[in-house]
Design a protein with these regions (language model features):
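Conserved catalytic or regulatory cores that recognize and/or transform ribose-phosphate-containing ligands
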Residues: 1-139
Length: 139
């Protein structure tokens, strides 16, 4: 299964950990943005290149996972995932659930019918998404 993980730069290590579990189990990361990290100071051409790569990767993924909280890019990617969702799972994860319950932290798109919201410790998310269970319900 092809997957994409979106999150803020501050959560890049969690994205790497989750991607490692999924790739070790035979799944394909459509674009590993954690390899280049923050590119905002690298100029307009580089940012354009990364933007195209990330849009294509989100669109091509069969499963999209957003680790919340995320930044502007994460929320843009959530929108792309919802808009291109044919045969795609769109999973939003929050350790505390605050992003889904606190008005100053939530977003209307978190409640789109195509979205699966998951609240649990990160280690539990990893277990839920482990290869043998990747296609089963996470509810």
């Amino acid at each position: 299964m092809r997957f994409y993980i979106a999150t803020g730069l501050s959560n890049a290590e969690m994205a790497k950990t989750l991607a490692g579990v999924l790739t070790r189990n035979g799944h394909e990361f459509t674009y590993n943005w954690t390899e280049h990290g923050d590119i905002r100071s690298e100029g307009e051409d580089r940012m354009t290149e990364v933007a195209f790569s990330e849009v294509r990767a989100v669109r091509d993924a069969e499963m999209f996972i957003a680790l919340l909280p995320g930044g502007c890019g994460t929320h843009t990617e959530i929108g792309i995932a919802i808009a291109s969702r044919s045969n795609k799972r769109v999973i939003l994860w929050s350790e505390t659930g605050d992003e889904f319950t606190k008005p100053d932290r939530c977003c209307a798109f978190y409640f789109h019918p195509a979205v699966e919201r998951i609240c649990c410790p990160f280690e539990e998310l990893i277990s839920k998404l482990d290869a043998d269970r990747i296609d089963t319900s996470l509810s």
